[in-house]
Structure formats: C-alpha cells, structure tokens
Amino acid sequence: MKESEIQEHIRAACNTGNTRAWRNNIAKLNVRGRWINYGIPGPGGSDLLGLHTLTVTPDHVGCRVAVFTAIECKNAGGRIRPEQQNFIDFVKKYGGIAGIARSPNEALSIINEFKPCP
C-alpha cells in the first residue's frame, strides 16, 4: 500500500469515538524568490493533527494533559468566515480552546479563561 493510502486508513480510524484527526499538508513554495513554508508547525510537522477528548479521572490528578488550541487572528475590521466559525465551534465542542482574537491580550484571554468543564 502506498503511504498516502495508509495515511487515509489511519485518519479514518482516528475519526471515531472521542478522537478527530485532519490531514496536515506541508509544503514549501517559492514566491518571488522567497520560500514560504505551509503546514503546522512547518517542516517536520506530522501528517495528521487532531484532538482527543479525555475525561479526567482521579488517576489523572497531577498529570499534564495537552489541550488543542486554535486562535483565529483578525484585525480590527476583519470578519470571520462561516467555515472559520464552524471550526472554532467544532474545537470547543470537543473540549479544545478556540476563539477569535484581534490582539495578543484577546488571545491570552481566550486561553486563560478556558474551563475544561462547563
């Protein structure tokens, strides 16, 4: 099987239960003599990114659990597109941190005001 086929099978298997995964496209493009990297986090990024919802139990007390975070950055007059709002809503639905920030302070507020349980 080609790697792309294996990746698709793995992605499909990960999109069950409390886990969601997306394909992360990594690329490099020469734009007017300047190389631009695409993808998260750029070169070396994993093929699949996602989140897994974990119910914290007493066994987890004192353990560190990473929480997927997505901040959509806009300028003062910038408007969010419906698909961007849908992604923010999706991340929040599955327990992640997400929001729209127009300044560093707004971004920090989104992160610092996160409460894992409603």
Tell where the protein language model's regions lie, with residue ranges:
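Catalytic phosphate/metal-binding cores of nucleic-acid and nucleotide-processing enzymes, i.e., regions
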Residues: M1-P118
